[in-house]
Amino acid sequence: MARTNTKNASVWKDGFLFVGNHLALDFLNTQPVQDGEAMELLPDFASLLGWFQTAGLLSPRDVEDLKRHWGQSAEARRTVEAMRGLRERLRKEILTWEDGGTPQYSTIDELNQLMAAYPMCARLRRRNRKQLLTELYFKRQRPEDLFAPLAQAAAMLFANANHDRVRKCDQCVLHFVDTSKKGTRRWCSMQLCGNRQKVATYAGRRRSASVER
């Protein structure tokens, strides 16, 4: 998996990758690998807020408010560490789940506790003068409130997604939900890994043809 350049810039958004087709997997993908080294895309609270904003979970005003009140706090640092810990536990569970296993009871309990402590709430608002709609939201008062959408997303992934369609890229550590009609997607994205694999396959065929001559 190569980082941003002219060819693959379209799959990066504000320094983050959104190729998972699911919020929980996009969160998992905040630690990609480049040249054999893990890249930490959530090194601090500002980066975490940036990811939430790019994912459409926080508005610019939300980000500024949280930065102003909590940016340099111990609570913000603890939240970042806790988020990264959750990410690694989910990574292990999702790898097992993709192979047909089931999440451990400890993970189920952790997600239930997070959803109870930091719930997603529903509210009614106007779509236009004649129509109403409901939308989900979460409190944005403290750093740990950010667990709300992530815990729900992980729970929804395990409960509703077809694990046969949730995969790790053949060429890197990124995960995705395969939404293709045939269910044959193998790469995180064509720009990042698909084209590279096709070039390698083509080069291999050319080498084989040269040897046979």
Which role fits each region the language model picked out?
Residues 1-168, 212:
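Short helix-coil boundary/hinge micro-motifs
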Residues 168-177:
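Acidic interhelical loop/turn segments
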Residues 203-213:
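Contiguous alpha-helical segments
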Residues 178-179, 199:
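Short, non-ligating residues that shape and space the ligands of small metal-coordination modules
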Residues 168, 198-201:
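Residue-level recognition of specific faces of alpha-helices
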Residues 173, 189-194, 203:
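Cys/His-coordinated zinc-binding microdomains
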Residues 166, 185, 190, 196:
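Residues immediately within or flanking Cys/His clusters that coordinate Zn2+
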